[in-house]
Amino acid sequence: MSWQAYVDDHLCCEIDGQHLTSAAILGHDGSVWAESPNFPKFKPEEIAGIVKDFEEPGHLAPTGLFLGGTKYMVIQGEPGVVIRGKKGTGGITIKKTGMALILGIYDEPMTPGQCNLVVERLGDYLIDQGY
């Protein structure tokens, strides 16, 4: 299965009639493995900040998480495993695997829990597969 198929079929799939706004799978170095067409264009330093927060949980809390110039308030995640952010009626979930970052961005009517489920389920699967 291609990385793009994981984004199209597993991240951008329908869940309770809702879809993620955008999604991507990136390498820890910020290289794009696959992304939805409307995934925000990000800066390398934004990905570096995300990776640093996985290594040093709490790093992003004072400044917020930035992706594509959008600022998300960091909310409770799982230190070193999952970062969650909130902005208005939407937010972001990022799951770290051994080799990749799985990112899902949502807005209402999708709920944070639905986004977490989709992103973390794929991340757990990829971890089980050695990624």
Curated annotation (Swiss-Prot):
Subunit and partners: Occurs in many kinds of cells as a complex with monomeric actin in a 1:1 ratio.
Gene coding for it: PRO2
Record keyword Ribonucleoprotein present: no
Localisation: Cytoplasm, Cytoskeleton
Location (main, coarse): cytoplasm
InterPro entries, per database record: PFN, PFN_euk, PFN_sf, Profilin_CS
Record's protein name: Profilin-2
UniProt-listed Pfam families: Profilin
